[in-house]
UniProtKB/Swiss-Prot annotation:
A Pfam family that the UniProt record links to this protein: DUF436
Top-level taxonomic group: Bacteria
InterPro entries attached to this UniProt entry: Antibiotic_NAT-like, DUF436
UniProt-listed HAMAP family: UPF0340
Record family assignment: Belongs to the UPF0340 family.
Protein name: UPF0340 protein SPJ_0612
Length: 187
């Protein structure tokens, strides 16, 4: 697999999702990543540390330049816990849990987050403002309500299917209520 192509596709998709979601500085962005799927394999079966590092480092650079915080979801072997910066865990009141990811428990994305973040910790649960799912890892449990599907500019990174989620406030009040316009809500 061509690493330059994977990096280019990752950059294109992330920048497109950020444009479509209009995330603000300080927002939480969750990443689900199967390096196995990126390489054309079955999720969890052919994990690649190199691919995890390439993708996470690329995304951290893009998000960091915008002041957006990355949370990297692990697999079910770590109960889908997430790696974030300690400062983010403290700022958002997230519960820190004790686990250190491995290639086959947590995955390559989490290992990469531990490598590239300043002070990484694992947290049990978050409510991110938006997220990117590379390889059908199921990030929905970590994106706040109401979740809105985003169609990225590319449908795949490498061989992995790509989807994204944004969120918007719940609409309450009924027939007489009026709602502000936003870029996420479909009218």
């Amino acid at each position: 697999m061509n690493e330059t192509q994977i990096q280019r596709e990752t950059r294109q998709v992330v920048e497109d999702v950020l444009e479509k979601t209009n995330l603000k500085q300080g927002a939480l962005f969750v990443l689900g990543l199967s390096s196995s799927e990126v390489l054309g394999g079955q999720i969890g079966k052919e994990s690649s540390q190199e691919i995890g590092e390439l993708i996470v480092e690329t995304i951290l650079g893009i998000l960091g330049s915008r002041g957006i915080h990355l949370a990297v979801q692990g697999c079910e072997h770590v109960n889908r816990a997430l790696v974030v910066e300690r400062q983010v865990a403290e700022q958002f009141g997230l519960e820190i849990v004790s686990v250190h990811p491995t290639l086959h428990a947590g995955g390559s994305g989490q290992l990469a987050a531990f490598k590239f973040m300043q002070d990484p910790v694992e947290v049990e649960f978050i409510k991110a403002h938006a997220g990117l799912d590379i390889g059908d890892t199921a990030i929905g449990m970590h994106v706040k309500h109401v979740q809105v599907p985003i169609r990225p500019i590319l449908r795949e990174i490498g061989h992995a299917h790509v989807t994204a989620l944004a969120s918007r406030p719940k609409l309450i009040g009924g027939a007489r209520a009026h709602y502000p316009q936003d870029a996420i809500r479909k009218t």
